[in-house]
């Protein structure tokens, strides 16, 4: 519980959106009840309220919005993963970095032999275990093929990117919009930075990178939806996150 904290999401809705603000508000109420009403209740916001609470939001085409609560990682994702590994080590687990699996094979006694390789030295050896858990994310199918495991389903890949820029607002609140193509679009506070995104594009391979088109999409959409003294430009990008 100490790893997460409540944070408010602030959603602005523009004219022409596919649902009225009241409909979205009712959805947020259902979401709140599913969470046993543990957080602060959602609010239905007028255009005037949005201007008062978050003047950085462009309300020129606004029909109102909602404010609701969700949770976020206090330590952010990188530190969270590191702490997870540290706790696992204390519990008796063994963790190995830069080690890749070359496939697993089940033996006659029902145990598994997994061939692994140190990617820094090239050394290879085998590890015996009672079970093998394939938690390779987008590389699950590839790992299954190395182990001659077949299933009914295959992964379909979608790429999302975020851009990290200087902090846009002083309030610890996630700004939520709907981009030009209708997808959810966030401006997330993270320390003295703001993380903006995301895109959602179908790709054929899990290895991805940020393209000029990705940057242009994010920049155009955020500049339309916030009132800044100077519109964000590519030179304002401090770092990029994608996957």
Question: What spans do the regions from the language model cover?
Answer:
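Dinucleotide-binding Rossmann-like beta1-alpha1 core, especially the glycine-rich loop
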Residues: 1-53
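Active-site substrate-recognition segment that forms the wall
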Residues: 3-8, 103, 126-130, 134-243
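Conserved Rossmann-fold dehydrogenase catalytic segment
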Residues: 7, 11, 15-18, 61-71, ...
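Helix-loop-beta segment of a Rossmann-like dinucleotide-binding subdomain
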Residues: 51-91, 95, 113, 126-127, ...
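Flavin (primarily FAD) cofactor-binding/catalytic cores of flavoenzymes
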Residues: 87, 99, 118, 224
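A conserved short coil-to-beta-strand element within the FAD-binding core of flavoproteins
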Residues: 97-113
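Short, hydrophobic/aromatic-rich segments at coil-to-beta transitions
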Residues: 110-115, 171-173
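A structured beta-alpha segment of the ubiquitous adenosine-cofactor-binding alpha/beta core
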Residues: 115-126, 130
């Amino acid at each position: 519980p100490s790893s997460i904290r409540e944070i408010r999401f602030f959603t602005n809705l523009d004219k022409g959106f596919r649902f009225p603000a009241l409909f979205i508000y009712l959805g947020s109420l259902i979401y709140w009840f599913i969470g046993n009403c543990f957080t602060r209740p959602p609010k239905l916001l007028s255009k005037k309220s949005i201007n008062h609470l978050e003047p950085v939001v462009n309300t020129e085409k606004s029909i109102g919005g909602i404010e609701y609560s969700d949770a976020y990682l206090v330590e952010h994702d990188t530190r969270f993963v590191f702490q997870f590994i540290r706790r696992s080590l204390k519990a008796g687990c063994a963790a190995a970095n830069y080690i890749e699996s070359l496939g697993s094979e089940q033996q006659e006694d029902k145990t598994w032999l997994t061939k692994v390789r140190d990617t820094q030295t090239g050394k290879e050896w085998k590890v015996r275990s009672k079970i093998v858990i394939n938690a390779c994310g987008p590389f699950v199918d590839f790992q299954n093929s190395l182990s001659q495991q077949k299933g009914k389903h295959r992964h379909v890949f979608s790429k999302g990117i975020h851009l990290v820029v200087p902090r846009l607002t002083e309030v610890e609140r996630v700004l939520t919009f709907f981009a030009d193509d209708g997808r959810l679009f966030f401006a997330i506070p993270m320390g003295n930075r703001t993380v903006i995104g995301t895109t959602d594009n179908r790709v054929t391979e899990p290895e991805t990178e940020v393209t000029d088109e990705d940057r242009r999409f994010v920049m155009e959409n955020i500049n339309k939806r916030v009132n800044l003294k100077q519109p964000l430009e590519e030179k304002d990008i401090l770092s990029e996150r994608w996957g």
